[in-house]
Design a protein with these regions (language model features):
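Positively charged n-region of N-terminal signal peptides that target proteins for export
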Residues: 1-4
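Bacterial N-terminal signal peptides
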Residues: 7-15
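Hydrophobic ligand-binding cavity/cleft-lining segments
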Residues: 18-70
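A conserved amphipathic terminal alpha-helix motif
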Residues: 20, 135, 139-181
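Hydrophobic/aromatic beta-strand elements that line small-molecule binding cavities or substrate pockets
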Residues: 30-32, 63, 88-94, 118-127
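A short, structured loop/turn motif at beta-sheet edges
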Residues: 35-39, 93-100, 124-135, 180-181
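Hydrophobic pocket/interface hotspot
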Residues: 40-44, 51, 78, 92, ...
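Glycine-rich portal/gate segments that line the openings of hydrophobic small-molecule binding cavities
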Residues: 62-114, 170, 174-181
Length: 181
C-alpha cells in the first residue's frame, strides 16, 4: 500500500515539475580571421580597459578593481557605454596568456541595460591556418534580459540574440580595422 501511495504522490507532482523550468540558454559564436600575428591580436584584446580602442560602438570605458559579489575576490571591472545608449558592467574572470583566452562576464544590475542577463564571453585567439594571420573565436552564453520564458518584447530571446550578434559583429569589424592598418 505504501508503494502505491508513494507512486500516486510522485505522479501528482509531475505536472509541477514542468513549470519549474526557466528560460532557455542562448549561445552566439563568431569566428573571424585577422591579418595580424596572434601575439599582436592577443595584446590588443587582453587589455580589458582598451575595448574602446578597437570596438567601434564603444563611446566610453571606465575600469576599476573591486570585490566580486560572487567570489569576494578583487577583479577588474569595466563599465562600457555604447553609441546606442546601452551600457553594461563586465568583470574579467580570467586572462590566460598560454591559451590566449579571455573569460569575462556581464554583471547584471542597474549598470547593464543591454537586452541580456547572465552573459558570459570567452574570447580566444589562435594561429590561423594562413601564416601571419589569427583566428579569433568569440563565444557568448546568456539568457534574455527578463530571465523568463514569457519575456516581453525587447527583453526576450530574439532581442538578446540580436544584441549579442550586433556586439560581436561590431567587435569583428573593430578588431580587423585596428589590427590590419
Amino acid at each position: 500500500m505504501k508503494k502505491y501511495l508513494s507512486i500516486l504522490v510522485m505522479a501528482s507532482l509531475l505536472p509541477f515539475g514542468a513549470y519549474a523550468h526557466g528560460p532557455s540558454g542562448q549561445k552566439v559564436e563568431k569566428k573571424f580571421e585577422v591579418k595580424a600575428e596572434p601575439a599582436k591580436v592577443w595584446a590588443l584584446v587582453k587589455d580589458f580597459g582598451a575595448i574602446g580602442k578597437w570596438h567601434p560602438d564603444v563611446t566610453n570605458v571606465k575600469v576599476e578593481e573591486k570585490p566580486d559579489a560572487e567570489t569576494g575576490k578583487v577583479l577588474l571591472h569595466r563599465l562600457v557605454s555604447l553609441k546606442n545608449g546601452t551600457s553594461f558592467l563586465e568583470k574579467m574572470r580570467e586572462a590566460n596568456d598560454d591559451e590566449m583566452k579571455l573569460d569575462y562576464k556581464m554583471v547584471d544590475g542597474a549598470d547593464s541595460t543591454i537586452a541580456v542577463s547572465n552573459y558570459r564571453t570567452v574570447l580566444q585567439v589562435k594561429p590561423s591556418e594562413t601564416s601571419g594571420q589569427t583566428l579569433v573565436i568569440m563565444t557568448a552564453r546568456f539568457y534574455n534580459k527578463a530571465n523568463t520564458m514569457e519575456a516581453p518584447p525587447g527583453a526576450d530571446n530574439p532581442a538578446a540574440n540580436k544584441a549579442s550578434n550586433e556586439l560581436y559583429d561590431a567587435a569583428a569589424i573593430g578588431q580587423k580595422s585596428a589590427m590590419e592598418k
